[in-house]
Amino acid sequence: MLRAFGAELQLTPGKEGIQGAIQLAKELVASVPNAYLLQQFDNLSNPEIHEKTTAEEIWEDCEGKLDALIAGVGTGGTITGCARFLKQKNPKIKVFAVEPSSSPVLSGGNPGSHAIQGIGAGFIPNVLDMNQIDEVIRINDNEAMDIGRRLAKEEGLLSGVSSGAAVAAALKVGNQPEFANKRLIVILPSFGERYLSTTMFTSIPAKPVKGNEYL
């Protein structure tokens, strides 16, 4: 998709993770005239814009009636900004962060490899305010992909693997007795078209459909 828009891709080894991509970006900025690095893991404008826009939209659409927010942590900007706004409106709102179970850095564990692109950077981003988070929920690769596929088949939502992880976490929260009949807000940040060539969708067995099957 990026190449279709004329972009030149500079790929880094998968084993280097996000840190490898950040390091290459810094090297490119140093060598390319007039280059600018957004630094989304460090730029305070990241959580600020979510506090001013995303969170306000959530509050207005819900008419102030929500009990919990569940979101994956990539840069940490979305969950930090939204949590700050929502907790100012209602301190009783609980905020749940989602991270890969094989890279439980937010839970105090060690970074590791995983297949949930978009979250689990392997370090705690500078823009992430852990004081806003009430609980961290760990989701494994299979859970994220399974729920992501179900979202497409059962709900008509073609979303990415990090969205699958967020909904998987929301289901766990919703199954807790204290959240029965409560309103949970889940942020789905990824669209599925970016994942059609990944294991998440290529593992779906092809099933031929007859033309008159739905007539």
Predicted feature residues:
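Alpha-helix C-terminal capping segments
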Residues: 3-4, 81-90, 168-178
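Glycine-rich ThDP/TPP pyrophosphate-binding loop and its adjacent helix/strand module
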Residues: 49-93
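Active-site-adjacent helical/loop segments in soluble small-molecule enzymes
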Residues: 131-180
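Small/polar-residue-rich loop-to-helix segments that shape phosphate-bearing ligand pockets
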Residues: 1-68, 98-152
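Residues at the starts of beta-strands that form the adenosine-phosphate
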Residues: 8, 92-94, 183
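Phosphate-binding loop/pocket of nucleotide- and phosphate-handling active sites
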Residues: 168-215
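Ser/Thr-glycine-rich phosphate-binding loops at phosphate-binding pockets of nucleotides
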Residues: 71-79, 162-166, 184
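Short beta-strand segments
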Residues: 39-40, 72-74, 97-99, 185-190
